[in-house]
């Protein structure tokens, strides 16, 4: 029984009378009118295939008592189903129990909380909700690559281990081969010159800086890989390990950046609506009732643009109390972002040109001397989902911004050096892949959209 067909293909239109082999796991089983019914799922789609096992099978008595979670291989004939809700079923001619499952199997037929399912992350992909989440995640990852490939962007693999902190926040996970119980010392401090890389190294927080270097050779590039933040945060929106999508474009300014971000985000919204319809309908029914309407609205809308200063004025005039203060020079909080996108604009909006004091050193200083060419894309329900900027291409101003931010220019000499020869205006943005999945599925905790979440004090599996 080697030639198998995926259940998705059978349900999509395999003609009645066709002999097929399916392999999967029993979701439910029941006995009625002298036959056993097994609902078998192979992960290829949300729906299970009903297998009808009749008493003539050699192991019929075994199948009558088969447990939820058992793995089976089934040979049978596709037949039109008399039951409501399914077009076809499989009349088994042979069923092999590949791997049994007793009543101790944790995913019995009942509703489990997401909190409980996190404790059995090795099994939760077998549930309906997480099967849908990870099918959508896979499809979106493929869509990301397709979007950029169609537009001629080069895919760049940036390093996981780095000696630089792109955001300057000091949230690196350290990588060392030194003996923690007896590290070499020099002048009262750990002597990292004796470490593997002869310097302090850590896991990357972003591939942006290296991506910029490649944009100065290939014009349009993107990175898509894991990033790490040693941030001791236990919110539903933060994880220590997550994936980032970071395009960079040479010969581009902030408006070019916003245009790419809008095209990209709308493309991904349309992709899940068109290619993940069954799973999206499941999320709309069981996770977030307004999901489909919201994603459809974003996919079909044009995004607004608003100056940071104008956004502050809107917030000051708001007839609702905010938990966090609103003043020019303060960063926007989620409550402010949601008010702007939901109440002021009624759809997605780019907020642009932020005070330089609250943004990163690499963002291009505007001519007013107070703001930088930064942008955040705000969307209903979640607030900020994309952050980007035009990068500072002028050597002297970049060096000055680094010193102002307490970053030693010599520590990023190569980044500065790229501005010496053939420097061009360039821009890019970052989109957290998990936050994208949360937005497009309605899942409210980042731990539930990544296979094995890494958060403070949790690194199991």
Curated annotation (Swiss-Prot):
This is Asparagine--tRNA ligase. Keywords: Aminoacyl-tRNA synthetase, ATP-binding, Cytoplasm, Ligase, Nucleotide-binding, Protein biosynthesis. Homodimer. It catalyses: tRNA(Asn) + L-asparagine + ATP = L-asparaginyl-tRNA(Asn) + AMP + diphosphate + H(+). Its EC number is 6.1.1.22. It comes from Geobacter sulfurreducens (strain ATCC 51573 / DSM 12127 / PCA). It holds the Pfam family tRNA_anti-codon. PROSITE patterns: AA_TRNA_LIGASE_II. Belongs to the class-II aminoacyl-tRNA synthetase family. GO terms for cellular component: cytoplasm. It is found in: Cytoplasm. The keyword Zinc does not apply. CDD domains: AsxRS_core, EcAsnRS_like_N. GO terms for molecular function: asparagine-tRNA ligase activity; ATP binding; nucleic acid binding. InterPro entries: Aa-tRNA-synt_II, aa-tRNA-synth_II, aa-tRNA-synth_II/BPL/LPL, Asn-tRNA-ligase, Asp/Asn-tRNA-synth_IIb, NA-bd_OB-fold, NA-bd_OB_tRNA. It is an enzyme of class 6 (ligase). The keyword Flavoprotein does not apply. SUPFAM superfamilies: Class II aaRS and biotin synthetases, Nucleic acid-binding proteins. GO terms for biological process: asparaginyl-tRNA aminoacylation.
């Amino acid at each position: 029984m080697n030639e198998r067909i995926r259940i998705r293909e059978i349900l999509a239109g395999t003609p009645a009378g066709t002999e097929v082999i399916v392999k999967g796991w029993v979701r439910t089983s029941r006995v009625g009118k002298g036959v056993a019914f097994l609902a078998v799922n192979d992960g290829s789609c949300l729906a299970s295939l009903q297998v009808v096992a009749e008493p003539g099978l050699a192991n019929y008595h075994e199948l009558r008592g088969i447990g939820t979670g058992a793995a089976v291989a089934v040979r049978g004939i596709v037949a039109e189903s008399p039951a409501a809700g399914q077009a076809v079923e499989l009349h088994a001619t042979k069923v092999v129990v590949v791997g049994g499952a007793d009543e101790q199997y944790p995913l019995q037929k009942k509703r489990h909380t997401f909190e409980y399912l996190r404790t059995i992350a090795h099994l939760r992909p077998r549930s309906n909700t997480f099967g849908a989440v990870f099918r959508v995640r896979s499809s979106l990852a493929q869509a990301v690559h397709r979007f950029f490939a169609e537009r001629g962007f080069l895919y760049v693999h940036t390093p996981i281990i780095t000696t630089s902190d792109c955001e300057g926040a000091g949230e690196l996970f350290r990588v060392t081969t030194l003996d923690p119980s007896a590290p070499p010392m020099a002048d009262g401090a750990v002597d990292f010159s004796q470490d593997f890389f002869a310097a302090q190294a850590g896991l990357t927080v972003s591939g942006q800086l290296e991506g910029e270097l490649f944009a100065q050779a290939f014009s349009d590039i993107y990175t898509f890989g894991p990033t790490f933040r040693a941030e001791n945060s236990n919110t539903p929106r933060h994880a220590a390990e997550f994936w980032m999508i970071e395009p960079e474009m040479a010969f581009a300014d902030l408006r070019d950046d916003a245009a790419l971000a809008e095209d990209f985000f709308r493309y991904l919204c349309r992709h899940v609506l068109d290619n993940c319809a069954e799973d999206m309908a499941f999320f709309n029914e069981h996770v977030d009732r307004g999901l489909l309407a919201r994603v459809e609205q974003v996919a079909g809308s044009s995004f607004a643009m608003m100056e940071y200063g104008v956004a502050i004025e809107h917030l000051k005039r708001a007839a609702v109390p905010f938990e966090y203060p609103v003043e020019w020079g303060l960063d926007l909080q989620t409550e402010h972002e949601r008010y702007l996108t939901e109440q002021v604009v009624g759809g997605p909006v780019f907020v642009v040109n932020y005070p330089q004091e609250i943004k990163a050193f690499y963002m291009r200083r505007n001519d007013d001397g107070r703001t930088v060419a930064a942008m955040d894309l705000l969307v209903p329900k979640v607030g900020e989902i994309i952050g980007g900027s035009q990068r500072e291409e002028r050597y002297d101003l970049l060096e000055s911004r680094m010193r102002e931010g307490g970053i030693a220019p010599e520590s990023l000499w190569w980044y500065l050096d790229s501005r010496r020869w053939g420097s061009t205006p360039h821009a890019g943005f970052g989109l957290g892949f998990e936050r994208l999945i949360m937005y497009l599925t309605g899942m409210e905790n980042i731990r539930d959209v990544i296979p094995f979440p890494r958060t403070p004090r949790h690194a199991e599996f």
